[in-house]
Amino acid sequence: MPPSRNRHSAQRVFTWDKIKMALAAAEEGFYIWNIKTGVIHYTDRCLTMMGASRKEKAPNIFTQPELTIHEEDQAFFSQEVRRYLDGHSHVPMRIEIRMKKLNSKSWSWVRVNGLARRDKQRRPVMLVGVWVNITRRKTAELRAAEDRDLFHTLIEHIPDSIYFKNRESRFVLAITATANELGVPAP
């Protein structure tokens, strides 16, 4: 089949409705920010992540981060957006932030992805991308870190000699008491 025929066929298959279905299946929201005018458009999924509705004017997270982004993440977010838009990266923008839901004041983790469209002078004129709710992943990572810390605290206070070796019989973990017994530096 000639390539031009495949291209036309794909254009009929990949309709906006199907793209929206795919974004919904991936639990991703889509945004378009016109940098020149400051106007931003969000899909319903972005608005849901933000705790906003179509009836209200949702803030632009890029120009008003203080309204939706966690205080501890605002400077990092603004710096990373600026660095990306200034052309210091050749890969798409990816920033993980905590976002406040406007309707409940609860927080969720969101990865903001973006790709800039640039004019002939390489100045950014538009940023297009998706938001991904990563709260489940971040929660799991935090729980795993807490479990790891608890595990290390528990084994450090057991008076017995405890260590772990890999298949090559190399030490991969030893508690301080065991390290002292073996005469090696404590981990």
Kindly give the residue locations of the regions a language model identified.
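PAS-associated C-terminal cap
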Residues: 1-21, 130-147
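PAS-family sensory domain signal
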Residues: 15-66, 109-111, 154, 161-186
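Hydrophobic pocket-lining residues within nucleotide cofactor-binding pockets
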Residues: 35, 117, 134
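Short, ordered coil/turn segments that flank beta-strands lining enzyme active or ligand-binding pockets
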Residues: 35-36, 102-103, 120-121, 167
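PAS/Per-ARNT-Sim sensory domains
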Residues: 56-83, 91-95, 142
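Per-ARNT-Sim (PAS) sensory domains and their PAS-associated C-terminal
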Residues: 72-76, 85-115, 121-125
